[in-house]
Amino acid sequence: MKSLFAADIRDNQAVDAMFLVAAKTHGVTKTGNSYLTLKLIDRTGDIEARVWERADDIGRGFDKNDFVRVRGQATLYQGKMQLRVQDVMRVDESKIAPEDFLPKSAFDPQAMLEELQTILRGMKNPHLLALAEACFADEELMRLLRQAPGAKTIHHPYLSGLLEHTLSLMKLIQKVVENYQGVDVDLLLMGGFLHDIGKVYEFTFDRAVDYTDAGQLLGHLVMEVEMVTKKIEAIAAFPTELALLLKHLLVSHHGAYEFGSPKLPQTVEAVILHSLDDLDGKIQAIQNMPEKEPGSKWTAFHRAYGRSFYRIKTEEP
């Protein structure tokens, strides 16, 4: 069993532990020497590792997605923990406990799915209700939804993260619509449910979280529109305009062309969905960022957001 985890590694600590190699890249220094940069992960997070000596020899002994035993020294570099590696050895899978290596949601996936289904079964629109039930009846889709990560890196990047994010978004929708008149709540809830459903096919997550070929070539927006279109076509008399408005929610929810949406939000429901999706993703990412250093009130620098964040310490009731 694994005894030392990435989140527990401290500055100047000697490390001898098992990890999953999530990324492996080869580089050359200015003096012409080879080195390796590794992303090592376990269920608590990841740590960057560098192999400066014997990089070619060591690198031939393992590949990306291998389980490995790593020996090295931890150092704090620019606010992030890093390993200077002395040796890497591939480990046979029979010696591995898979639950040690992929992080997962703190919440029970079956309980989250049941809460999500309860919310959607409260919809009054019979066509959207039929679409929801068609999705629930798809056992493979539900199996993947219970397991899929919310993203590869930015927010909810762990098993069942997609379901956690989707449920959180739908609960936010329920609260926000109370403040506005004229919003199609059922359409918005269904959009919240389906907005990232294509990620169950975009990612592979049997070891590290990575993209499938379809995820690389198409992306989840295209894949989920295709999936939803097929399910709608199997429902008798599903209104054409309703299908159009629902698919608009899916393709516009990233909110901007530069973030991958082919269309900007052009309905009130689309604006709400994009805004709440963005909010939930950012809050989760910020709350789960590592400290700049142990005990610091500041997080490490977040490259996607271009800043560090100050954490206010709240008193427990």
Predicted feature residues:
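OB-fold nucleic-acid-binding modules
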Residues: M1-V15
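Divalent metal-coordination and catalytic microenvironments
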Residues: F19, N65, L169, D277
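Extended, charge-rich, solvent-exposed interface segments
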Residues: Q82-Q147, M223
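Divalent metal-dependent catalytic cores for phosphoryl transfer on phosphate-bearing substrates
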Residues: T153-H155, E164-H165, K175-E293
